[in-house]
Amino acid sequence: MFNPILSVSKSIPEKYLQMSQEELENHIQAIKDQLGNRLFMPTHHYQKNEVVQFADITGDSLELARICKENTEAEYFVFNGVHFMAETADILTDDSQDIYLPDLSAGCSMADMANITQALHGYDVLTEKFHLDILPLTYVNSTAAIKKFVGEHGGSCVTSGNAKSVVDWALNQGKVILFLPDQHLGRNTAYDLGIPLEQMAVWDPIAKELIYEGDLEDLRIVLWKGHCSVHEKFHKAHIDMARERDPEINVIVHPECEFEVVQAADYAGSTRYIIETIKNAPKGSRWLIGTEMNLVNRLKETYTDITIDSLNPLMCSCLTMNRIDLPHLAWCLDKILDGNKDNIIKVDAETAKYAKESLDRMLSIT
């Protein structure tokens, strides 16, 4: 499992912290110009604007996975995202291409909620004690080790953008799905496909307990008890209060939100879906968005002819995504020029082989 404390070997030199924003921007741009097409900088939508301005492409997890796989020209990928995204890029790209993460402490709390030891134990209990024929699926927000586990057992990765297609595929395999590590995306997707809540269970990896209310024989999906630390901060009460103030308000949320929030919202979908919905919204319409704050603020700045706010007025940005900043980006690019490999993310060959199977299966389904 990724351990940000063990992964960080050196503190950022003080000189980068002392540089002005203009100096950092000029330094970064100069290196981009120098390296040209040898450098590629995929950047997640949740990044802040100071980083997004240098992106060669912005996207959600599915878009970035596809783009990295298709790019055979770049020698260096500087991934402005979090650790599991850089791992995914390494798995999908050629061995001759290096993947850099500007700050090695940019992890993901959701991915850390399912380590491989827990997954193997949970699988054994579900298959041996409860006699369930399990097909595992994992959200791409997971470690390479979890993706390997899923690939070895014939399963697939999913993203919020293709979860419905992949879960539908899995349901048609005649097995019980084990959905890692985000219970909310799994529950919302399965329910949207017509699976009632009583045919869902939750596996608690800490208590080592299977929680269900219906008949065990009717189970269609077991949800890993994990969640996104950002999207869990949106609640149905936020929607209720907003509609009391403004009955005409439009509410759109990410499916990583709790089931009650998704059911109460007017719209729910992936990051790409949210962006496209806001882009095509009628002028003068009013929107509350339940997703990461950097993206909400960027949409608010971009589409000024509609009213946009966060569903939770006290919301903050994703803390680990925000670890990627101009000083770390400049430092990382200097390391590339110096031949320093400290920030390279490399997945071992055996893990990458089976993890790639789960990723390729996802891409073939969708």
Curated annotation (Swiss-Prot):
Q: What is this protein called?
A: Quinolinate synthase
The main enzyme category here is: transferase
Molecular function terms in GO for this entry?
Answer: 4 iron, 4 sulfur cluster binding; metal ion binding; quinolinate synthetase A activity
Q: What job does the chain carry out?
A: Catalyzes the condensation of iminoaspartate with dihydroxyacetone phosphate to form quinolinate.
One GO biological process term is: 'de novo' NAD biosynthetic process from L-aspartate
Q: What superkingdom heads the lineage?
A: Bacteria
Q: Which organism is it from?
A: Staphylococcus carnosus (strain TM300)
Residues bound to [4Fe-4S] cluster: 108, 228, 318
